[in-house]
Amino acid sequence: MAERKASVERDTLETQIKASINLDGTGKARFDIGVPFLEHMLDQIARHGLIDLDIVSKGDLHIDDHHTVEDVGITLGQAFAKAIGDKKGIRRYGHAYVPLDEALSRVVIDFSGRPGLQMHVPYTRATVGGFDVDLFQEFFQGFVNHALVSLHIDNLRGTNTHHQIETVFKAFGRALRMAVELDDRMAGQMPSTKGVL
């Protein structure tokens, strides 16, 4: 089996980002982004998706976190698209429900080749530790646009904003793990009746 790894660099006037992933990893993660809460959430993707992630970013954090958070999503999406290749043999679809105390979230993903995001998270606070939680919409939109996936994110309940977000990212990691997993019964076949994704 060919290694499903990729490294991508993004260099703009706002951010310089290097991202490396291994879809068949063990959940190892290393981050140097400068946005601790984002790094904490990315660690959930790695751990629960069993995807090795290494992301280094230098951005205009003196302005705010927006460009860095969005561009990390873009770069991660590009890395996924590159690592997954032609998509032959993958399960394609993934879903997960994850609870954390009072919070419960559901994430469903389709590596369809058609970008689309439906995200419904009724945050109970605007910030967590100074981090603007609205920026996660930008992160996921960037990921979706460049990984070329359809992604549905729903926080079904929760009163603690940190818990709401953490359940989303844990469910996202688990849904990714399911979707990118190779299915022995689909070996070498495209998971679509069209023959292409």
From Swiss-Prot:
Compartment(s) of residence: Cytoplasm
CDD domains tied to this protein: IGPD
Record EC number: 4.2.1.19
NCBIfam families: PRK00951.1-1, PRK00951.2-1, PRK00951.2-4
Signal peptide as annotated in the record: none
Reaction catalysed by this enzyme: D-erythro-1-(imidazol-4-yl)glycerol 3-phosphate = 3-(imidazol-4-yl)-2-oxopropyl phosphate + H2O
Gene3D superfamilies cross-referenced by the UniProt entry: Imidazole glycerol phosphate dehydratase, domain 1
Protein name, per record: Imidazoleglycerol-phosphate dehydratase
Pathway the protein contributes to: Amino-acid biosynthesis; L-histidine biosynthesis; L-histidine from 5-phospho-alpha-D-ribose 1-diphosphate: step 6/9
PROSITE patterns, A to Z: IGP_DEHYDRATASE_1, IGP_DEHYDRATASE_2
